[in-house]
Regions:
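Membrane-embedded alpha-helical bundles that constitute the cytochrome b-like, heme-associated redox core
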Residues: 1-295, 302, 317, 321-379, ...
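Glycine-rich, aromatic-lined ligand/substrate-binding cores of catalytic
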Residues: 309-314
């Protein structure tokens, strides 16, 4: 293996003044260095700076594309034939089940890897000037990947896929003014059917992949234009005026190759051990109990249990997304790029915020489930007030309290305080996702895993 890496390094580094500009060797090198800097700071090669998450995402997208192309040879985008074609794929095609497993698991891993990649960028302040636009591009890519996962989720046309997608698309109906029309446009009618499957198939196999690949290329090019990755530092370190630079080839490229091979090995191992789920055929007349959204939308579904849908989707979720897009302009994250958690105080405030969110979220969910019933306590009041306006006001008050509790006792500066609030919101959302995915049973009632609700 070491010898193979050395030969790969030689292939990259070897050059000749007489080399044909149209040779595959020269073309490949030109392409690579169009989206990669020729020189990188030596300290950015440390694995613990990025954990290879960006490279893993590229590998997972590549696996998605290649396995998706293979799946198209067997898949038929029509309600009855869709399910039957997957049965034939899994039983009659060589390695059909394995190819579908790779596609399924790489899609799920991609969501997690991109989430962690975004956290790494945020906590090292790698979204400030000159990387502000790239932060927005990265968030857009994350949302597009979620859309790609959702459109692909429906394609098996089994009970789980049909009703989980129904739950997700039902959220669109709560957008005032355009929600119902937007829902009908996406589904091609009043409910999921042949038109919806055609739309989702076209989006999943053509529209979204093209946009994702184009934005990924632009994302890497922006990293190159910004001079590569931010140079890692400790909070107490005096910034270097001129970091030590080394050639990307082979120092960076071989490390990326090692990460790519490791990521592929992990996906292939999981795909060998665990099959992608396929339940009974979709039955529009029989809703399973409970009906849950895919795990990456479970946090949003849990929000709908506690907030009026209009407030949960249009106000809380929209404001949170807007705040994340505007983070480079709000003063959050590491004040000096490359410094994890901005400072030693930033580390303490982030840990405190994470612990607070981890405790407050389950307590609030339990109180809302078994104790608080604003609709019953306020008979005659519209639900938009009792289940929307008041809970939202309480939530905003909670955030204000967290801000004050962090700013004053810890004497935190604005970047550390904004960072702690982001940590609080993220941990809260992760907790809501876990609660909905694991601790919700029949009728979306709370229950311990494996215990049936009464």
């Amino acid at each position: 293996m070491i010898e193979k890496f050395r030969s790969l390094s030689f292939w990259f580094t070897s050059h000749s003044s007489h080399e044909d500009p149209q040779s595959p060797h020269r073309i490949f090198k030109t392409l690579v260095f169009h989206i990669r800097p020729r020189m990188v700071a030596e300290r950015t090669l440390r694995f613990t700076l990025t954990f290879g998450l960006g490279g893993m995402a590229v590998v997972l997208v590549t696996l998605q594309i290649f396995t998706g192309i293979l799946l198209k040879f067997a898949y038929e985008p029509f309600p009855v034939q869709a399910y039957d074609s997957l049965i034939r794929l899994q039983t009659g095609f060589p390695f059909g089940q394995f190819i579908r497993n790779i596609h399924f698991w790489s899609a799920n891993f991609l969501v997690g890897v991109l989430f962690l990649h975004g956290l790494r960028v945020f906590f090292t302040g790698a979204f400030r000037t000159p990387r502000r636009v790239n932060w927005i591009v990265g968030l857009s890519l994350f949302l597009l990947v979620l859309a790609a996962n959702l459109t692909g989720y429906l394609l098996p046309w089994d009970q789980l896929a049909y009703w989980a997608t129904t739950i997700c698309l039902g959220m669109l109906d709560y957008i005032p003014g355009i929600g119902n029309r937007l829902q009908h446009w996406v589904m091609g009618g009043p409910q999921l059917g042949p038109a919806a499957l055609r739309n989702f198939f076209a989006l999943h196999t053509a529209v979204l992949p093209v946009i994702i690949c184009a934005l990924m290329t632009y994302h890497f090019w922006k990293i190159r234009k910004a001079g590569g990755l931010v140079v890692p530092k400790s909070p107490e370190e005096i910034p270097e005026e001129k970091p030590t630079m080394v050639p990307s080839n082979p120092n960076l490229l071989l490390r990326e190759a090692a990460v790519a091979l490791s990521a592929m090995a992990c996906v292939l191992t999981v795909a060998l051990l665990f099959d992608a789920p396929l339940g009974p055929p979709a039955n529009p007349g029989l809703s399973p109990n409970p009906t849950k959204a895919p795990w990456y939308f479970a946090g949003v579904q849990e929000m709908l249990v506690h907030f009026h849908p209009t407030f949960a989707l249009l106000i809380v979720l929209s404001l949170a997304l807007g705040a994340f897009f505007l983070l480079p302009y709000l003063g959050g994250g590491a004040a000096s790029p490359g410094v994890w958690f901005a400072s030693a105080d930033g580390r303490r405030t982030s840990v405190a915020a994470a612990i607070a969110a981890g405790l407050i979220t389950p307590i609030a969910v339990i109180l809302d489930e078994y104790v608080i019933d604003l609709a019953a306590w306020m008979p005659g009041w519209p639900q938009v007030v009792s289940n929307g306006l008041i809970p939202t006001a309480l939530f905003i008050g909670l955030l204000a309290g967290v801000y004050i509790a962090i700013r004053k006792p810890f004497r935190a500066q604005r970047p550390e305080t904004v960072q702690a609030l982001v940590v609080f919101l993220l941990v809260m959302f992760v907790m809501l996702t876990i609660i909905c995915a694991i601790f919700r049973g029949e009728g979306m009632a709370l229950r311990w895993p494996g215990v049936r609700s009464n």
